[in-house]
């Protein structure tokens, strides 16, 4: 009995440590998300074509950061200020989207499971800080752009999403199209860059303006110049 308990405990510890051991390996390569794996195993539609960060127009990562994580360049994986605002709103009975950084979403997508769970959040926080410490901001963003869900039919990554929405590679997106892609996050099933409604178009205009902010121009390196 004790041996079985010991084996179970060691197995649990091993599972908890596995993401921390795998993270340094993700400095290179084309990692996939747990949702992509699940859809493949279950036979659900899934398409993804990796695109390198350097091939993307600068407006795309800037628009996504403006949309999803305005403090991406300055935080260490967790945006504590935004998190406190979300908690304060929850105490007041207001449940708003927000609080999860791009780094947290990478942690969840690579190693954890979707849906709301206190257990998942407890695992996600230290993992996001570890990812931020081990990977560069550019690499974190590159992974996010290639594993986020970006279409209603199992399109994962901005390349598959761009080909679905506009019929061409993400490498050739205009600033307006890049902002539309950012505007459909985090719900590309209900929102559409292909046939954007008034709300999506309004958000895209906001993100286009935010993407020009000076602080987003020096956050990462290696992207082709404007």
Curated annotation (Swiss-Prot):
Entry's localization field: Cell inner membrane
Gene Ontology CC entries for this record: peptidoglycan-based cell wall; plasma membrane
Pathway this chain belongs to: Cell wall biogenesis; peptidoglycan biosynthesis
Any one of the GO BP annotations: regulation of cell shape
Sorted UniProt keywords: Cell inner membrane, Cell membrane, Cell shape, Cell wall biogenesis/degradation, Glycosyltransferase, Membrane, Peptidoglycan synthesis, Transferase, Transmembrane, Transmembrane helix
Gene Ontology terms for molecular function: pentosyltransferase activity; peptidoglycan glycosyltransferase activity
Chief location: membrane
Source organism superkingdom: Bacteria
Protein's name in the database: Biosynthetic peptidoglycan transglycosylase
Cross-referenced InterPro entries: Glyco_trans_51, Lysozyme-like_dom_sf, PBP_transglycosylase, Pep_trsgly
Transmembrane feature ranges: 7-29
């Amino acid at each position: 009995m004790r041996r079985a308990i010991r084996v179970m405990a060691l197995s649990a510890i091993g599972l908890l440590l596995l993401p921390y051991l795998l993270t340094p390996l993700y400095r290179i390569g084309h990692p996939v998300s747990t949702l992509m794996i699940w859809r493949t195993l279950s036979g659900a539609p899934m398409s993804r074509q990796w695109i390198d960060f350097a091939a993307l127009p600068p407006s795309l990562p800037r628009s996504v950061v403006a949309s999803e994580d305005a403090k991406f360049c300055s935080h260490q994986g967790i945006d504590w200020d935004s998190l406190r605002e979300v908690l304060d709103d929850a105490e007041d009975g207001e449940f708003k989207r927000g609080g999860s950084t791009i780094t947290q979403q990478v942690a969840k997508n690579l190693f954890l499971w979707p849906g709301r769970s206190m257990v998942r959040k407890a695992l996600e926080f230290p993992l996001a800080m570890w990812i931020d410490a081990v990977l560069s901001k550019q690499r974190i963003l590159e992974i996010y752009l290639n594993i986020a869900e970006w279409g209603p039919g199992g399109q994962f990554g901005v390349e598959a999403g761009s080909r679905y929405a506009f019929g061409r590679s993400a490498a050739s997106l205009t600033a307006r199209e890049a902002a539309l892609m950012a505007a459909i996050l985090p719900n590309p099933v209900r929102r559409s860059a292909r046939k954007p409604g008034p709300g999506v178009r309004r958000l895209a205009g906001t993100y286009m303006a935010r993407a020009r902010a000076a602080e987003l121009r020096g956050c990462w390196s290696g992207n082709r110049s404007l």
